[in-house]
Amino acid sequence: MQTMTETLQKLIGKPLVESTDQEIYLALLDLVRSKSAAQVRPVNGRKLYYISAEFLIGKLLSNNLINLGLYDDVRDALAAAGKSLSDIEEVEPEPSLGNGGLGRLAACFLDSLATLNLPGDGIGLRYHFGLFHQSFADGLQNELPDPWLNEHSWAEKTDITYPVTLAGKPYTARLYKLAVTGYEGRTNTLNLFDLDTIDESIVHDGIQFDKTAIAKNLTLFLYPDDSDEAGRMLRIYQQYLMVSAGAQLILAECAARGCNYHDLADYAAIQINDTHPSMVIPELIRLLGEKGIKFDEAVKIVTDTCAYTNHTILAEALETWPRSYLDKVVPQLMPVIEKLDAAAKKRTNDTGLAIIDADDRVHMAHMDIHFTHSTNGVAALHTEILKESELNGFYKLYPEKFNNKTNGITFRRWLLECDPALVKEIESLIGPGFRKDAAELEKLLPYAEDANVLQKFSQVKADNKKALADWLEHTQGVKVDPTAMFDIQSKRLHEYKRQQLNLLYLIHQYFEIRAGHTPAVPLVSIFGAKAAPAYIIAKDIIHALLTLSKVIAADPLVAPWLQVVFVENYNVTAAEKMIPACDLSEQISLASKEASGTGNMKFMLNGALTLGTMDGANVEISQQVGNENIYIFGQTSSQVIHRYAAGDYNPADWYEGDPNLRRAIDFLTGPEMLAAGKEENLARLQHELKTKDWFQTLPDFNAYVVRKGQALSDYACDPLGWRRKCLINISKAGFFSSDRTIAEYNSDIWHLGE
């Protein structure tokens, strides 16, 4: 039997010691492809098709090597030749197929499906430049293309194409296939569609391009800027390309397995991930009509086949489109949507549940709920809010459709791959069973009283912090003190996630330190976030944080105690460095606004403690670990919802009534900030906080300051107690495995393989 060294040298055609990192990477790509192909299994019974606008899959080499059981052999073979697997990984570009939690969840779900030996493929688009590559200049976010495709991409071109009609014109969707390996499981597929006519050269001045040149631009960017009509139309073009090609793929695959279309629900389960793929419902009905199936039967078939996941409580994210847009882009769908609307209106007199409303807007989520057999939320609190308030009318109409599936994360990437030293310590105590059964982490609980074990885990954290400090210096040009407390808020930049609350805290700390009230421990506050190109206030928050970072660094009194670092172009690769090094995880969204969150789970799994509101999955984390092992603050979701309903929140009252808050907000346009930043951006953010503050930052400010102060004090003054809390968090993280989530989806909704 060949050794790994011999296998790689045969693939490369020369000794490893003489091979470049690029040559070794390509050899490993070939090796993974051949091994993953051997894990493809035949499909019997029902197969899942998970349709999502984004899949934030991250780099794939190490993840695939781990899942295929090759990682240790490859690492050792390379080391023997004086090579480093981490250097080889640098050759690999990160796929630009997603942006935030929605896309990362989809990627975790694909991993778990394959690991659990369940037949389930993804369907999405092959974006060329992703959302954008973020860079900072003059304290401002700039957007550039984020290229990743090359001839050696993991996504392999096929000869399979499907015709798609957009605005009456014919286009040809090309299928690319990307293998998804499971941990000691099967290989599934991520199906990505593209047009051969895409022209990357039309992009100029950052991420500007002609939004009307559909044949050239359709898959260039994820979520093209929708601040104008052309951008909004482009999103509909994208969504229809995805669902039309996807629906044709599903029907073709099912027919090849013996489906006669009448029995489609016995062959396929389709999960609609948020509202972007909603048009798959009318498109499937239209295609079944072309197969000779009458409308009413087609509606029943599609309803029995499709299920919908709601990911948001924010009205802005529940997509609605002007009927005129759909008339132009997908005129072939409008007769179907009109019939569906008429059918829905026969079921209820509640006009608020209509698919087409009185203003001629088409509500995608409404179509999803009416014409799928399942609607799920993604955390217990989120699902209750949907049932009791946001979607209450639908819940009264279809109580049997509503269910909860609390999100999860794949422990292969977020523990085995990104924190191998922690894995080694865990295995030395409880064995390797947790790799396949995350619930086994609970066996760590008795060690929470073992000071020697706690010290070893603490050393792993210290080493990870040193590694992050080195990475920050190498990639960001920033030096940080690895012995300081690392406080991290990394997630999409949005006012409801409240990076602005953290900003006000940091300004407050700046004043406290200048007044001689030094904190219990030096604090390094690390951010990672992209703001949507047209989201002005979000970009102003980034500017304020970057400006504050400069002000603090220039102050000899404050700099030894406080540092603000904003990581440029936050992505999965950066997350894999930051999460294992975190001490305090910031999960501070306004209660009732975060559906679930999954960053909270990743940080917890890697031994960080959570500072958070009772929102999303924070609620379930607190239930798992106990209130004494998490730092909860702020209003409850019911208090927030009541305040919105009363309509009596006036941020000016809080600004005028709290000297510390007023001092922090005034500082945004104080001489120190204006000397380092731009008045237009800082004044606009200040005005927003004083006059609007839609996500109630000000009422939670004092509670946040107090609770964060308690966390710093505990970290500095009771290190043993802090370590104990960290170990308890790790031991209780098993519930948040995406394997558990997927098993629940399968038992309650999909019934795959049956």
Describe the residue ranges of each PLM region.
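A conserved ligand/cofactor-binding region detector
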Residues: 1-754
